[in-house]
From Swiss-Prot:
SUPFAM superfamilies: P-loop containing nucleoside triphosphate hydrolases (SSF52540). ATP binds at G501, D502, T503, G504, C505, G506, K507, T508. Residues 80-148, 292-359 form the DRBM domain. Residues 39-65 are annotated as: Disordered. The keyword Cytoplasm applies. This is ATP-dependent RNA helicase DHX30. Its main location: cytoplasm. A motif (DEAH box) lies at residues 603-606. One of its GO terms (biological process) is central nervous system development. It comes from the Eukaryota.
Length: 1231
């Protein structure tokens, strides 16, 4: 620390001199280097001489002491880039610190080097090294955090201070004068904010010609800045890193002062030559501007975006006793000022004060004598750009295409209404009208069992049961077994029973068996048909397999499961069917009263997921239709009395569990075990709700448990897939050649069930099993050999922002009940250990239970489901019956959106479109895109896109995001579409599968960073959606959907049409791209893009290829997924779409303004699209749009296979013309 003190003293000594230039570099032991620099203005020869000198004695030892091992630094500062951003952001009142932290990358043969330029509170450089760019950046940032801590800018536990304290600390450090350029938030009074400019001015040649600045020309420094910014954007942004807050030029202009004078008005009239002025005038000017040289330098730096002022202002001083200074300015036009003084500095200050006086008269300094913002200095360019952006996009349609449109409209006038059969309602309700209902167990048509058949089947079941020998229950007793009679009696006597069973009591596997056994032994086994819901696919399958095993080979066929894309149902009559909640909801559409079902068991009801809460509403109503149905709610933890009260005070049967003792450790003890300091980021964030994981700490803890802990499996709870893969990769790297001694197994819904069976198997002797799982392993699955539980204390939770209408999947702290569940996983089979990676004080702040999902998610899909099951009720009426009713405003917003996209009418009834898409099991907007694709005959690519938006095909992780983005860009080619990249990725996968070459298959996955299990799942989704389309009468056969030769795929190769159909389904998810933006600090960026939606400004996430697009061919993007993070809304997937697709294919109203020669057309619900053209073209496009709309309406009223031949031919002509239109140029960008 003594060496660190020397370093800080040196920094403080240099700080008052202004910006620091690179000086000597002493390398630390672990590849980190901190450089203190020398004041700007020293001669180059002096620098060269110093660099030739050997390091002072002990310098290497001081450096080694000063710079810790990089690993220790990263443990002390686990998220260093975020921490630096937060300190500077809070100190300066800015949303990002990009201008104050510049990362310069140098690629070495084996290692990456990063030089971090820190421009606040002092100009200092630090270096970092790593095998990857992000590692080098993090090392450099950690070294910078160490400096900040030494300067007192961080608390003992790395906590932040308030802005006022940072200003005080900055004054003490003598830091540069920082302010919000346009708002004048605060000024440092501790000294000059720029270097002593006299040295560099003295070195300038006085006779250099001074040229005026060209109006509208951006200086060279702007290009340099953009390069640095580009380097920043190329690097990996850490999770949570702040994004720049900015507004587009058109929004900024009305906020700027209309009378603001700019260089383009007064200053550009020509230069002025000012002779020696009266000394009193100069003194008055100096009184008005006490630090004139600083102010001049600041104004010029801000206005010109230059890092140096040498080329814009020169001082030339002559004389002996009386010094005469001539100041020549090149900006805003050539001007010369002269003043005298007894000393050189006095003369220079007077001349500079006169220059400041002149700038203020030109309106280039504000009333408080502070610089204006960069945008205000560039108002001329800004206004020109704003005017350019406001111009409509000019559309010119080829004459040949116009003739085709004209001929079509002459042959099929838009004012002639087609006669459409009124068959839509009949068609969509065929099964109900015929009286046919589906069997909830088998999925086939339900036929009640005859009494004789029932008796015979019951006798067979009894015989099978008696032949099974000793039961599994007898040899493997569980805590629930002694309560068998109490449970069965309660279920027999009450329509609803709540079973509150502690973790490990056996309720999930045993109670369904108890019900089946009870009915069989009473001779009515054929009447026992139990549907058991599980919240997740993996638990439905694994529990079914476990129960089948326990029942033995004679009864195994009576147990089955059904999840999305996987089904193995049992025969009806003495059946146990395990399924997900979504599957049961689907079954209720075909069997609303659950005829033929004896019991519904809802397991894990305490998790309060949105589907379970919705199911409870329906089950409450079904009891009136089917009084014989028995409902069993099973809960591990939670407020069980609430469930009882919801169902009219039904009984609650409590079943105590058995758990071996579990020794618990919290963060304080864990850090002590690892020999670490307590000031971890968990404690930094302790006062906030935010939680950020330290994957290195988790990895180290797992290795510590392996080295010193008891034998047995380790279960690590992590919030999501990225964290699972991050810890898995770290473990495999650390274990190295010893990998064979470990079984590292991820558990996640992204992984197919067949790839996760190993988690239930005991590993061979000498092999340690390490399971990395989300909260899926809390209650849904049981891994019997777990001894150690590592609890991160976090999980992913979806939250919906009503204001921005955007969902956010956030990492949040779990509840106390979650902590209890996780701890219980360690004591199932023997004494265990639980390691909680949060302080005990955090446990006290955790909520008792989770917030129900229905209160924090978008409700559109739920409203559609409500209309299917109870169409006579309004959405608010239906959802008010929930255990926890969602906000009425949230329900109303969902209804409004569904009305906007044409799913509901004004009476809240399902439209013809709504009835079709209700058959498709996905988000309503994606379902709409699928329905439209069947009409526009480009179905297969849309099925692939929707499937990939449901399950990402790329093998993305925190470490390989950049490579995945590059692979996606390659697949996208020139389409400007993430969605078409999905289509090409899946098409390539199908091609290599057809070759039956395993090496080619593996190479393809590796080359494009694709994940095989996800691609298999996507293939299954495509098949499921094909079945849905068949059920909705939109295709003749499910196989038509994937056949290139089928009618529904006639235009599947037309990329602009595919993107247009996707946009039509997702609308109003439309982005207008505008060139030029102004940051919150007033920085004008003419070459940057701003992105506007109907709801407001958004940002493009790094995962979309259009974020890095150097040139967009269209000003319009469509998207599906937007997430809220760090106060901004980020779009993760996007496609550039043709403006004519937006005009012609959306189902919103349009407005046409026609003067008889030129016409403009715009959307009435937003200002995102304004097109112009000649009147004739616009009128033809308007009528053509009506024809397309009528085609969609007509097709929705027909069974697609039964559309008459003349209509089919007419629609083919229409689609041919549309394809031609979309092949035309999209119009000039910004013109």
């Amino acid at each position: 620390m003594a060496a660190l003190g020397l370093l800080l003293q040196a920094a403080a000594a240099c700080g008052s001199a202004g910006p620091l230039r690179l000086g000597r570099c002493y390398r630390g032991a672990r590849g980190l280097c901190t450089r203190l620099a020398e004041p700007d203005g020293l001669e180059g020869a002096r620098q060269e001489d110093e660099e030739e000198q050997p390091p002072p004695p002990g310098a290497e030892e001081q450096s080694t002491a000063m710079v810790k091992d990089s690993r220790d630094l990263l443990k002390e500062f686990p998220q260093p880039k975020n921490l630096l951003n937060s300190v500077i952001g809070r100190a300066l009142g800015i949303s990002h610190a990009r201008d104050k932290l510049v990362y310069i990358h140098t690629n070495g043969p084996r290692k990456k080097k990063v030089t971090l330029h820190i421009k606040w509170p002092k100009n200092v450089e630090v270096e970092g090294y790593g095998t990857k760019k992000i590692d080098a950046e993090r090392q450099a940032a950690a070294a910078a955090c160490q400096l900040f801590k030494g300067w007192g800018l961080l608390g003992p536990r790395n906590e932040l201070f308030d802005a006022a304290k940072y200003r005080l600390l900055a004054d003490q450090l003598g830091c540069p004068d920082e302010r919000w350029c346009s708002e004048g938030k605060w000024r440092s009074k501790s000294g000059p904010s720029l270097a002593d400019l006299s040295t560099c001015w003295r070195r300038m040649e006085p006779d250099d010609p001074i040229q005026p600045m060209e109006q509208g020309r951006m200086p060279k420094a702007m290009r340099r800045e953009e390069l640095e910014e580009g380097e920043l954007e190329e690097g990996e942004l850490e999770e949570g890193e702040l994004e720049e807050e900015a507004i587009d030029v058109s929004d900024y202009l009305p906020m700027a002062h209309q009378d603001a004078r700019t260089p383009g008005r007064d200053a550009s009239r020509g230069g002025s030559s000012i002779e020696m002025t009266d000394d009193n005038t100069a003194i008055r000017a100096l009184t008005q501007f006490p630090l004139p040289k600083n102010l001049l330098a600041q104004v010029i730096q801000i206005a010109t975006s230059s890092s140096t002022v040498k080329e814009y202002m020169q001082f030339r001083t002559v004389g002996t006793k009386t010094k005469i200074c001539k100041l020549t300015l090149r900006w805003p036009c050539p001007m010369t000022f002269a003043a005298k003084g007894r000393r050189k500095v006095e003369a220079e200050n007077k001349a500079a004060a006169l220059a400041c006086q002149k700038l203020k008269s030109l309106g280039l300094v504000d009333k408080n004598n502070n610089p204006l913002s960069h945008a205000m200095y560039n108002m001329t360019s800004l206004r020109e750009l704003g005017e350019n952006q406001r111009k409509p996009c000019h559309i010119k349609v080829p004459e040949a295409t116009l003739r085709k449109i004209e001929n079509y409209l002459n042959h099929y006038p838009v004012d002639i209404r087609e006669s459409r059969p009124r068959i839509a309602d009949d068609m969509m309700n065929l099964s109900k009208e015929s009286g046919a209902i589906s069997d909830a167990i088998t999925g086939k048509t339900y036929i009640p069992m005859l009494e004789a058949e029932e008796v015979r089947l019951s006798q067979n079941l009894l015989a099978l049961w008696k032949r099974r020998g000793s039961s599994w229950q007898e040899s493997h007793p569980l805590p629930v077994d002694p309560h068998k009679d109490t449970i069965l009696s309660a279920i027999e006597q009450n329509p609803v029973v709540v079973i509150a069973g502690d973790t490990g009591c056996g309720k999930t596997t045993r109670i369904p068996q108890l019900l089946l056994e009870h009915y069989i032994l009473e001779g009515r086994g054929a009447r026992c048909n139990v549907v058991i819901t599980q919240p997740r696919r993996i638990s439905a399958i694994s529990v079914a397999q476990r129960v089948a095993q326990e029942l033995g080979p004679n009864m195994r066929k009576n147990v089955g499961y059904q999840v999305r894309l996987e089904s193995k149902p049992p025969a009806r009559g003495g059946a146990l069917l395990f399924c997900t909640v979504g599957i049961l909801l689907r079954k209720l559409q075909g069997n609303p009263s659950l005829e033929g079902v004896s019991h519904v068991v809802v397991d894990e009801v305490h998790e309060r997921d949105v589907n379970t809460d919705f199911l409870l509403i329906l089950l409450k109503g079904i009891q009136k239709l089917n009084p014989d149905l028995r409902l069993v709610l099973m809960s591990a933890t939670g407020d069980n009395q609430r469930f009882s009260h919801y169902f009219g005070g039904c009984p609650v049967v409590k079943v105590p569990g058995f758990m071996y003792p579990v020794k618990e450790y919290y963060l304080e003890e864990i850090l002590a075990k690892l020999g670490r300091h307590r000031h971890r980021h968990y404690e930094i964030k302790q006062s906030d709700d935010e939680c950020v994981l330290d994957l290195d700490l988790i990895t180290d803890l797992v290795l510590q448990i392996d080295a010193h802990g008891e034998p047995g499996g380790i279960l690590c709870f992590l919030p999501g897939w990225q964290e699972i893969k991050g810890v898995q990769q770290r473990l495999l790297e650390m274990l190295g050649s010893q990998n064979s001694r470990y079984l590292v197994l991820p558990v996640h819904s992204n992984i197919p069930m067949m790839d996760q069976q190993n988690i239930f198997q005991r590993p061979p002797p000498g092999v340690r099993k390490i399971v990395l799982a989300t909260n899926i392993a809390e209650t849904s699955i049981t891994i019997n050999d777990i001894v150690h539980v590592v609890d991160s204390g976090t999980h992913k939770e979806e939250r919906y922002d009503l204001k921005t209408k955007v969902s956010c999947l956030e990492t949040v702290w779990v509840s106390k009940s979650n902590v209890v569940q996780r701890r219980g996983r360690a004591g199932r089979c023997q004494s265990g250990f639980a390691y909680h990676l949060f302080p005990r004080s955090r446990l006290d702040k955790m909520p008792t239970y989770q917030v129900p999902e229905i209160l924090r998610t978008p409700l559109e899909n739920l409203v559609v489901q409500a209309k299917i099951h109870m169409p006579e009720k309004t959405a608010v009426e239906f959802l008010s019956k929930a255990l926890d009713s969602p906000d009425i405003k949230a329900v109303d917003e969902a209804v409004i959106l569904l009305q906007e996209i044409g799913v509901l009418d004004q009476r809240e009834a399902l439209t013809t479109l709504g009835k079709r898409l209700a058959q498709i099991s996905t988000d309503p907007r994606l379902a709409k895109a699928i329905v439209l694709a069947s009409i526009y005959r480009c179905l297969h690519p849309l099925l692939v896109i929707v499937s990939c938006l449901t399950r990402d095909p790329f093998s993305s992780s925190l470490q390989n995001r950049a490579e995945v983005d590059k692979a996606k860009a390659v697949l996208s080619r020139e389409s400007g579409s993430d969605h078409l990249a999905f289509v090409r990725a899946v098409a390539g996968w199908e091609e290599v599968l057809r070759r039956r070459d395993s090496r080619a298959r593996d190479n393809y996955l590796q080359d494009y960073y694709l994940y095989g299990p996800s691609l298999r799942f996507i293939n299954g989704l495509v098949k499921q959606f094909s079945e849905n389309l068949y059920e909705a009468f939109l295709v003749s056969s499910p196989s038509d959907c994937t056949m290139p030769s089928s009618v529904c795929n006639q235009y599947s190769e037309e990329e602009e049409l595919v993107k247009g159909v996707l946009m039509a389904g997702l609308y109003p998810n439309l982005i207008q791209v505008r060139q030029g933006k102004v940051t919150r600090q007033g920085k004008f960026k003419p070459n940057s893009y701003a992105y506007r939606t109907k709801a407001g400004t958004v940002l493009l996430h790094k995962s979309t290829i259009n974020r890095e697009a150097s040139k967009l061919y269209s000003r319009w993007l469509t998207y599906f997924m937007a997430v809220k993070s760090n106060g901004g809304v980020f779009v993760r997937d996007s496609s550039q779409v043709h403006p004519l697709a937006v005009l012609l294919m959306t189902d919103t109203d349009i407005h046409v303004r026609d003067d008889g020669w030129r016409a403009t057309v715009s959307l009435t619900d937003s200002d995102l699209l304004v097109l112009e053209g000649d009147s004739y073209t616009i009128r033809l496009l308007r009528d053509f749009r009506v024809s397309l709309s009528k085609m969609v309406e007509t097709c929705l009223c027909y069974e697609m296979a039964a559309i008459p031949g003349d209509l089919h031919h007419q629609h083919s002509q229409l689609l041919d013309i549309l394809v031609d239109l979309l092949k035309g140029p999209p119009g000039s960008f910004g013109a």
